[in-house]
């Protein structure tokens, strides 16, 4: 692979002004037209004066420069062991941005058909990030790229270490099951301002993209303790991600795609169980199909070649649990039922069932007798989420 040598390295970063695309007047107009819609979706532009504006500007400049490295040194094959351990630190004016396992993620992005130029344009300077106000109890910050295609989340050091330790097996799982429902992790980075403490963050594809017509969003863990969110007041611009108890009385009507969904959930949760991971979520969003989008032939004609690309035979396609993908952006996370389009993806893959979580399990067992909660063994967690999916689909 024509890439920098493995191990920690520190280099001066190029400036995004040297090569990033200019924001054209038509693009500015598009951004302005999106602002009203974004406010109605509960997304808030991180503009000058926002407390996170400085941080996100550094992230944008740093990600532009980091992506330029992978564009200058594109991967020529699957990642090596050294690629998974490489750490590149680029020095900018006033901050440093670290890129962890950069060549491995560059290869993964390429395998997903994601052009580095598009990735750089979406995450770099050119449009402010959007703040997403999460109902999560964690202290993480959540952002969306200005086009809402990519999701950024701050992570703790322990979680980042777990993600990187599991990265080779994660890549292998996606190779074996190209239509996996696991969220596509696209980058892991660190940001350090004026030689201070590092802030780690990840970049992933947004499960809820494109979001324009989505009516409901849910974060499902398959349990009941702390799994209720008070809905937003009528007329509020804030669109909340609701939880398990809010989902009562609802179903996911997938029709003939239900069997594929159940099988893929089994494959993905088995993989996470083998990693000793728990506390992940199934994200679900509803979008009502237009009349011309309904019916078995509405989007099948143009999608067959893309869906079977890479499979050598029908037997291999079945072993990989491939399906016909919709002719839509973000097709890996979209399943169409008879009446609704569903956005589905498994996220938050970094919590390991170590000593801390075992002690938390014991405490919650005493605190919530007879009730279900998230901190259980990975085997029980995987089984329970699959049971929830089976009970709430038709």
Curated annotation (Swiss-Prot):
Its EC number is 2.7.1.68. The keyword Flavoprotein does not apply. It holds the Pfam family PIP5K. It is an enzyme of class 2 (transferase). GO terms for cellular component: cell projection; cytosol; plasma membrane. GO terms for biological process: negative regulation of cell migration; negative regulation of mitochondrial membrane potential; negative regulation of phosphatidylinositol 3-kinase/protein kinase B signal transduction; phosphatidylinositol phosphate biosynthetic process; positive regulation of apoptotic process. It comes from Homo sapiens (Human). May act as a scaffold to localize and regulate type I PI(4)P 5-kinases to specific compartments within the cell, where they generate PI(4,5)P2 for actin nucleation, signaling and scaffold protein recruitment and conversion to PI(3,4,5)P3. Keywords: ATP-binding, Cytoplasm, Kinase, Lipid metabolism, Membrane, Nucleotide-binding, Transferase. Residues 36-393 form the PIPK domain. The keyword Membrane applies. It catalyses: a 1,2-diacyl-sn-glycero-3-phospho-(1D-myo-inositol 4-phosphate) + ATP = a 1,2-diacyl-sn-glycero-3-phospho-(1D-myo-inositol-4,5-bisphosphate) + ADP + H(+). Its main location: cytoplasm. It is found in: Cytoplasm; Membrane. Heterodimerizes with other type I phosphatidylinositol 4-phosphate 5-kinase. This is Phosphatidylinositol 4-phosphate 5-kinase-like protein 1. GO terms for molecular function: 1-phosphatidylinositol-4-phosphate 5-kinase activity; ATP binding.
